[in-house]
Design a protein with these regions (language model features):
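Short acidic-glycine loop/turn motifs at beta-strand connectors
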Residues: 13, 21-26, 124-130, 881
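N-terminal export/assembly segments and adjacent metallocofactor-ligating motifs
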Residues: 95-383, 424, 466, 506-522, ...
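Long, contiguous, secondary-structure-rich segments that constitute the structural scaffold
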Residues: 97, 153-155, 161-162, 166, ...
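N-terminal leader/propeptide and maturation segments of large enzyme subunits in energy/redox metabolism
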Residues: 168-212, 216, 230, 244, ...
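A glycine-rich phosphate-binding loop feature that marks nucleotide/adenosyl-phosphate handling sites
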Residues: 238, 391-393, 434-435, 448-451, ...
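Extended redox/cofactor-interaction regions of prokaryotic respiratory oxidoreductases
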Residues: 249-339, 343-344, 369, 467-620, ...
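Short beta-alpha connecting loops at secondary-structure transitions
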Residues: 355-361, 629, 636-646, 658-668
């Protein structure tokens, strides 16, 4: 965009200088110092000026000069950023060569690369439009994959990089009819008059210009800060984002939050709930929120295991975390070895249906009873690893006495659990006997250390029981460990490339993983906010409506970090008055979602802006809507399945380490802009554009990220831009591969896992000696819980069976006799690929078309359906006291009577009447789930403890 201005470049003492006049697309220049330059760039001396203005300058030197003020830039912020962008482009000229990136496929077609939550892909473009997307098939230049030798056979994955069905639907997501293409203002919102907050979610919108939208947003930010003080601004995004280290919310949004001083969201560990609030107290692993290490477990499982127990585990649906279908071939290898496979899940999930084996279907929320009964059999029949229990654990005797009934007079026998779970005692006894006599891997959750069962009312006790069972079997010895072939491949992790959770260009070393490596490799100005207020995500409605809320932090550093209450508002801070919401997912992913609809309509919140790609979910509640482009329409860079941070080395789910530039494949649709550009535009209006952007464009940040990694050692920037990806050779020699997870602990050696955690201060006698607990041992009796609250009945110091407060034994069961479970969906990454008019809607297991409308399926047993007069694909109302959702009934034997199943994360909020007060037909199952936390002293989700009733839907009449 052409601008008219005068730029002065000079030595600070005015001894030398040259100014440049830009006018109507032309530039002229003269020696000397201009008396009225619009932008002045002043250097301490000529030597520094020459050093920093040369081609391919040192970014470290440039940043350092800014930090010590030997380089200053003064002028209007928008012009300063414009000049900095221009000069960066000039001094990095070798990185820019027109449109010569991507691969020419002939006939006017270019092949680009990009990434997604469903995997990386090729993007074929012609005439500025996407033709198709495909998975990345490797070429002859790419290295061979790894081979594992096990039981006289060789196992080698194919030479391709997989992509999920929802990953490959991105073309239809880019061109979705629900795309937001222009800035919008609610028709009855007047920032200088009546704001009509009661009409949020009801009123329509009118198109406005970007200048008007940005002026309103920036002026509201300034007004609210001045009027109400620190803490009055609040920014909230979702757990996930479009792929890429630069555009990801922990990068671009995080720096924006710090630059302007927003209150932050206090996240709950939604994928790990039970392992974080319960499991970690037995063994630490706080950096992974209580979930286990899985280094080299794929090879160990193929070589040594005899049995696999998958408990609340469906990796064929959830892909671990971004792992797409990479683990499917490895589970195929396992099947070919005739290893016994057991599935424990109320729903006969997709992994069970594909892999086969024995299926156990406990009633929701009763899994812990089944686990304790298994422990009872092991104790009474001596089917456990006594060496491990005696030498690597502490407190077993107390737990053993509880199992045997010495504490409460109730032996936890298979017969006892049958009354709770509905599973015959003989079957549980047979399972326990076989498990206790075989070298067995166990996968609690699809990636191990997650799972739907940990997101129930007693999810912490379930997670604890999983760890206690594995401790009884001696985890870490050959063939006994955690995993289901989803994690733990022999890839080379000694090659540095950061995951998105390491913060991108955020410069934030408090709330990202940047301090581990990236802050040393990619120089930037520090990004720290002075605001210390947090709003608990699960209590946002209460914070808005009632003015106060309580949360507990998600702290990866210590066991005790989660014990500190985090009250809202913080001392000396204002209540939230301005809500900057990224995306629309909370209406579907957070429990008792109607609360969020009602919270938007309070006049306690004076201004709401939503920045989103699609018009869905809670976007409709904003005063101003800012349209965002997809990552197909901007530059970025990333690695397949690599999040980093609290899921360290996530790429070990993959069969190839795959790094890719995310080309700007097409121009942004309509007037949509990238998050980075929107944030920069707002910051410029508020005078902090330079601190936010450091004078870089997104392309500049991508190049800086490339330079910060090990990629320049193996591929040139030019070739990387052209080919689009690089495959790192795996570790071919078995002796060079990582030691198997926890083998060091089983054998009593120093920890040899390739990770820096836990922190040195967490070790008790010697660095890398023992676990993170007080004793350094696996603790059946948890010292941390004993110190914190030894008498807490919801979280006792030993693992116990605590019946669900919303289950068959609760009073509510008489009114709502169906137990609803809502695991993560198979065909969408949470809300990201659902709705939007995409091709995913045509998959009948995802949505069902009835009279031209795509309804969310609810699965019900034939016996329950017959009692209610429900037939296959009838429209039904799923309801309880929190609300109701209209779904399409799927009558199936894949769950037992009394249990119903519907995935969470429908993206489309479509109330039939007033928002928050009427049935929804978009499929927002979380309208029905409880907002109560698992235990009171936590900030935890219990969505899978949910009682409902179902009846036929007849429009505005139900029966």
């Amino acid at each position: 965009k052409k601008k008219n201005f005068t730029l002065q470049i000079k030595i600070r003492d005015n001894s030398q200088g040259r100014f440049f006049t830009f006018k109507n697309g032309r530039v002229s220049s003269k020696n000397g110092v201009h008396p009225g330059a619009d932008v002045t760039m002043a250097f301490e001396d000529a030597a520094l000026a020459c050093h920093l203005m040369k081609f391919n300058r040192s970014q470290l030197d440039f940043i350092s000069a800014g930090k010590d003020f030997s380089l200053t830039v003064n002028g209007p912020d928008e012009l300063c950023v414009y000049v900095a962008n221009m000069l960066t482009a000039i001094t990095n000229m070798s990185t820019i060569f027109g449109g010569n990136f991507g691969t020419d496929m002939g006939n006017g077609v270019k092949r680009y690369t990009t990434g997604s939550n469903g995997g990386p892909m090729f993007v074929y473009v012609k005439d500025g439009k996407i033709l198709r997307t495909t998975p990345i098939d490797l070429d002859s230049e790419d290295p061979e994959p790894f081979t594992i030798n096990a039981r006289g056979r060789k196992f080698t994955p194919p030479r391709r990089v997989t992509c999920t069905s929802h990953g490959l639907t991105w073309k239809s997501m880019v061109y979705s009819p629900d795309r937001l293409l222009y800035p919008m203002k609610r028709v009855d919102f007047d920032p200088k008059g009546n704001r009509n907050t009661q009409n949020r979610g009801i009123s329509g919108y009118e198109r406005i210009s970007w200048d008007e939208a940005l002026d309103i947003v920036s002026s509201e930010i300034a007004r609210v800060k001045k009027t109400h003080g620190p803490g009055s601004l609040f920014f909230a995004g979702s757990s996930h984002h479009t792929w890429g280290n630069i555009g990801y919310h922990l990068s671009a949004s995080d720096r924006f939050i710090n630059t302007l001083g927003f209150s932050r969201i206090c996240m709950n560990p939604d994928s790990w709930e039970g392992f974080y609030w319960g499991g970690m107290h037995h063994w630490g692993n706080t950096a992974k929120l209580g979930s286990p290490d899985q280094y080299s477990t794929v090879e160990d499982q193929l070589k040594n295991s005899e049995m696999l127990v998958m408990w609340s585990s469906d990796p064929e649906s959830t892909s671990g975390a971004y792992g797409t279908y990479e683990g499917a071939i490895r589970r195929e290898w396992l099947k070919s070895l005739d290893i016994k496979i057991v599935h424990i899940d109320p729903f006969y999930n997709h992994t069970a249906a594909w892999m086969g084996g024995k299926w156990f279907s406990p009633r929701p929320g009763t899994d812990t009873a089944m686990a304790l009964a298994i422990a009872y059999v092991w104790i009474t029949q001596d089917l456990y690893d006594k060496f491990f229990v005696e030498n690597r654990t502490k407190g077993f005797a107390l737990w053993r006495d509880y199992i045997l009934g010495k504490e409460d007079g109730i032996p936890k026998t298979p017969e006892w659990q049958e009354k709770e779970t509905g599973i015959p005692a003989k079957d549980v006894r047979a399972l326990a006997e076989e498990w206790g006599s075989k070298k067995t891997y166990m996968s609690p959750g699809g990636m191990a250390g997650v799972g739907s069962a940990c997101r129930g009312a007693n999810g912490g006790e379930w997670a604890r029981s999983m760890l206690c069972l594995m401790a009884m079997q001696g985890f870490g010895k050959p063939g006994v460990n955690f995993g289901a072939m989803q994690f733990g491949t022999p890839l080379n992790h000694r090659f540095f490339f950061p995951g998105y959770a390491e913060g991108g260009f955020s410069g934030d070393y408090n709330f990202t993983g940047s301090p581990v490596n990236l802050y040393q490799r990619m120089p930037s100005t520090p990004s720290v906010s002075s605001i210390t207020q947090f709003v608990p995500r699960l209590r946002i409605p209460e914070a808005f409506l009632e003015g106060h809320a309580m949360g507990y932090p998600m702290n990866p550093y210590s066991l005790e970090g989660q014990f500190f209450p985090a009250p809202y508002p913080s001392p000396g801070h204002s209540q939230v008055k301005l809500y900057y919401k990224y995306g629309g997912a909370y209406m579907s992913t957070q429990p008792e979602s109607n609360r969020y609809a009602l919270a938007y309509q309070t006049d306690n919140i004076e201004f709401v802006v939503n920045q989103s790609i699609w018009n869905e979910g809670e976007v409709r509640f904003a005063d101003i809507i800012l349209p965002v482009c997809t990552n197909f329409e901007r530059w970025d860079i990333g690695e397949f399945a690599h999040s980093g941070g609290i899921i360290d080395k996530t790429f070990l789910q993959c069969n190839h380490r795959t790094f890719f530039v995310q080309h700007k494949c097409i121009e942004p649709l309509g007037e949509s802009r990238s998050d980075f550009q929107i944030y920069t535009d707002i910051c410029c209006r508020l005078g902090v554009g330079v601190p936010y952007s450091e004078g870089n464009t997104e392309f500049d940040w991508v190049k800086r990220m490339f330079d910060a990694t090990d990629l320049p050692k193996v591929i040139s920037w030019r070739k990387f831009l052209t080919k689009g990806y690089y495959i790192l050779p795996p570790i071919y020699d078995e002796k060079d591969r990582d030691p198997v997870a926890y083998n060091w602990f089983y054998e009593g050696r120093l920890k040899d896992a390739p990770e820096l955690t836990p922190l040195p201060s967490e070790y008790k006698e010697e660095y890398r000696r023992g676990l993170q607990t007080q004793s350094g041992l696996f603790e059946f009796e948890c010292s941390s819980l004993k110190r914190f609250d030894p008498n807490d009945p919801e979280r006792p110091v030993i693992n116990k069976y605590v019946p669900s407060w919303e289950g068959r034994s609760s009073e509510l069961y008489q009114k709502y006799p169906l137990q609803l479970i809502s695991p993560h969906p198979r065909y969408s990454h949470h809300t990201m690929s659902d709705g939007k008019g995409t091709v995913i809607n045509e998959i009948s297991n995802h949505r069902i078309s009835i009279n031209g409308y795509h309804y969310w399926p609810v699965r019900i047993n034939p016996e329950d359906a017959e009692k209610r007069g429900i037939k296959h694909h009838d429209l039904v109302e799923v309801y309880n006291g929190r609300g109701s959702v209209i779904c399409a009934a799927v009558v199936t034997q894949r769950l037992n009577p009394g249990t119903v199943h519907a995935y969470e994360s429908a993206a489309k909020y479509d109330p039939t009447g007033l928002p928050g007060k009427s049935p929804d037909r978009g499929g927002l199952i979380n309208i029905l789930t409880p907002s109560r936390t698992q235990i009171r002293q936590s900030h935890s989700m219990a969505a899978n403890s949910c009682l409902v009733e179902i009846r036929l839907w007849k429009g505005d009449q139900s029966k």
